[in-house]
UniProtKB/Swiss-Prot annotation:
Glycans are attached at N49. It comes from Candida albicans (strain SC5314 / ATCC MYA-2876). Plays a key role in autophagy. Effector of VPS34 phosphatidylinositol 3-phosphate kinase signaling. Regulates the cytoplasm to vacuole transport (Cvt) vesicle formation. Plays a role in ATG protein retrieval from the pre-autophagosomal structure (PAS) and is especially required for autophagy-dependent cycling of ATG9. Finally, plays an important role in biofilm formation and resistance to antifungal compounds such as fluconazole, itraconazole, terbinafine and caspofungin. Its main location: membrane. This is Autophagy-related protein 27. It is found in: Cytoplasmic vesicle membrane; Golgi apparatus membrane; Mitochondrion membrane; Preautophagosomal structure membrane.
Length: 252
């Protein structure tokens, strides 16, 4: 069943945030970061480079010519041979600009309106289209006329996703092995303390000629203890099983 499109205006002035309730149905965490789209045009005697940067679930902060805390930032540079690039235009949609979300089964649009740019107000629309087979996660420029900016991206992140699927898609960062690692470390430490401490105790009691002999004796005792564990466990199981069977017999 196809859901009707919903248009929801953000009530709080926040950055493009993966935790926003309007984005909960999607998995933008999987494409979190700053994405860029660049066009290069020959404008003799120079070239004009226009780069649009979009911060998904994090503001733009590391790009030199972009204002801090921008969600979207466009930088136009004039390139001339043997000369440093000259920045001619910077268009910024700040993180505190109010946004609107237009969502559907086919994806979601994030809409920015009324960003100040010189004497005019400019608008932007990020159109994320659901494509379960897409691996590129790259923006394309649909429109920029000096007033309205439209960028689109075909991505799996824009497909409606359950919480269970989000957990499955998260990359293993090694945390799942943390407990096993710590248990192994503590076990090694415990055995080391047991063996060395036991050897030191035997040596101090005078039961061994030297510390090395005491250490060897403790290790041998420990090995014998390990060998006896299976039979000890078997005996415990047989006792419980035997009691259970006798109990059933008595009940009959």
């Amino acid at each position: 069943m196809i859901l009707a499109s919903l248009l929801t205006f953000a009530t709080a002035a926040l950055a493009f945030d993966c935790s926003d309730k309007e984005l909960e149905r999607y998995n933008f965490e999987s494409i979190k970061g700053v994405h860029s789209y660049t066009t290069l045009k020959n404008t003799p005697p120079s070239q004009t480079n226009v780069t649009w940067n979009v911060g998904i679930c994090q503001p733009i902060s590391a790009i030199k010519d972009c204002p801090a805390n921008s969600d979207i930032c466009g930088v136009t540079s004039i390139l001339r041979k043997d000369e440093k690039p000259v920045v001619s235009e910077v268009v910024s949609f700040k993180s505190d600009l109010q946004k609107a979300y237009e969502s559907s089964d086919n994806g979601i649009k994030v809409i920015y309106k009324g960003a100040n740019w010189g004497d005019v107000l400019v608008n932007a629309e990020l159109n994320f289209q659901c494509d379960k087979d897409s691996q590129n996660n790259e923006f394309t420029l649909d429109q920029w006329d000096g007033t309205n900016l439209k960028l689109s991206m075909k991505t799996k992140a824009a497909c409606i996703t359950s919480k269970e699927d989000k957990k499955k898609e998260k990359h293993d960062n090694g945390e799942s092995w943390g407990w096993f690692t710590w248990i192994f470390i503590f076990l090694v430490l415990f055995l080391s303390i047991y063996i060395i401490g036991g050897a030191w105790f035997q040596y101090n009691k005078g039961n061994a000629i030297d510390f090395q002999s005491a250490l060897k004796e403790v290790v041998e005792n420990f090995i014998e203890l390990l060998k006896g564990l299976p039979s000890f466990g078997k005996e415990i199981i047989e006792k419980f099983t035997g009691r259970s069977n006798r109990g059933e017999y008595s009940a009959v």
